[in-house]
Regions:
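Glycine/proline-rich active-site loop of Rossmann-fold NAD(P)-dependent oxidoreductases
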Residues: 162
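Rossmann-fold dinucleotide-binding core
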Residues: 75-154, 158
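Short low-complexity, flexible loop/linker segments enriched in glycine and/or proline
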Residues: 25-27, 44-46, 111-114, 154
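Residues in the short beta-alpha loop(s) of Rossmann-like NAD(P)-binding domains
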Residues: 14-15, 49, 119
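Amphipathic alpha-helical segments within well-ordered protein domains
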Residues: 3, 165-169
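NAD(P)+-binding Rossmann beta1-loop-alpha1 motif at the extreme N-terminus of oxidoreductases
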Residues: 1-45, 68, 104
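Rossmann-fold NAD(P) dinucleotide-binding segment
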Residues: 29, 33-94
Length: 169
């Protein structure tokens, strides 16, 4: 959806397959996290878990210049998010945690719900990007609060699922 809006998109993954369809549509493939951070003002991560986020964020922050923005779209540990935010601030890089809800269908259609934690002024500057990926995008507070809201949302969804299962027994 970012490509469809006419914006230039740089991509990186340790494997080529996940980014191939984007490259075929016009995205530019980068050979490393370092080259991605050199080409991009806004770096967005969507990774499987906290360990991957910690590794990739650390590597990205090593090569990011001041004034750039790092965004984590993963569902993650609020304490890890605050740790990354502290490191980013030391490097004069802005950081937002922005976990998403809506699955692959929402991602493909640009209709994700995004719960964003971090500085409001940074959130506001990314309005055109949020418009590409989500229809319900909310700034919910400081660093880590995006993930707190997402985890509460998950807990409520799972509680409802368990209640429904119990009712059917």
């Amino acid at each position: 959806n970012i490509l469809n809006s006419g914006k230039k998109l740089f991509v990186f993954d340790i494997r080529d397959a996940p980014t191939q369809s984007l490259v075929e549509k016009g995205a530019v493939s980068c050979s490393s996290i370092d080259s991605l951070t050199q080409e991009s003002e806004i770096i967005m991560m969507s990774l499987p878990g906290p360990e991957e986020v910690k590794i990739v964020a650390s590597e990205a922050l090593e090569s990011m210049s001041p004034g750039k923005v790092l965004v984590d779209l993963s569902t993650n540990s609020p304490s890890l998010i605050r740790e990354i935010d502290s490191i980013a601030k030391l490097k004069n890089v802005s950081f937002l945690d922005a976990p998403v809800s809506g699955g692959t269908r929402g991602a493909k259609s640009g209709e994700l719900t995004v719960m964003v934690g971090g500085e409001k002024k940074v959130f506001d500057t990314l309005g055109p990007i949020w418009d590409c990926i989500g229809t319900n995008v909310f700034h919910v507070g400081g660093a880590g609060t995006g993930n707190i809201i997402k985890l509460v949302n998950n807990m409520l969804a799972f509680s409802n699922m368990m209640s429904n299962a119990e009712a059917l027994i």
